[in-house]
UniProtKB/Swiss-Prot annotation:
One of its GO terms (molecular function) is structural constituent of ribosome. One of its GO terms (biological process) is translation. SUPFAM superfamilies: Glucocorticoid receptor-like (DNA-binding domain). The keyword Chloroplast does not apply. Part of the 30S ribosomal subunit. Contacts proteins S3 and S10. It comes from the Bacteria. It comes from Pediococcus pentosaceus (strain ATCC 25745 / CCUG 21536 / LMG 10740 / 183-1w). The keyword Ribosomal protein applies. This is Small ribosomal subunit protein uS14A. The lineage of its organism: Bacteria, Bacillati, Bacillota, Bacilli, Lactobacillales. Binds 16S rRNA, required for the assembly of 30S particles and may also be responsible for determining the conformation of the 16S rRNA at the A site.
């Protein structure tokens, strides 16, 4: 489980990125890099870090499912992820 402060920080960064997304797109299209550099640091999407949606774990994140490998494995064994089953060959 990630620290609550880290999870909240990531959520704030996501909100900031969403708030400035359109403005950033316009500034980039106009090649106004000076104004772009005046925007907040956290307005850049590269500052975001993918985290597990269940417990906030930052490592071993699986994009397709939005969770870490540990939670994916647990939920898959419990049969709570539709269409996922243990491989057997």
């Amino acid at each position: 489980m990630a620290k609550t402060s880290k999870i909240i920080k990531e959520q704030k960064i996501e909100e900031t990125v969403a708030r400035y997304a359109e403005l950033r797109r316009e500034l980039k299209a106009n090649k106004d890099y000076r104004a772009l550099s005046q925007l907040p640091r956290n307005a850049s999407p590269t500052r975001m870090h993918r985290r597990d949606s269940l417990d906030g774990r930052p490592h071993a994140y699986m994009r397709k499912f939005g969770m870490s490998r540990l939670n994916f494995r647990r939920l898959a064994h419990e049969g709570q992820i539709p269409g996922v089953r243990k491989a057997s060959w």
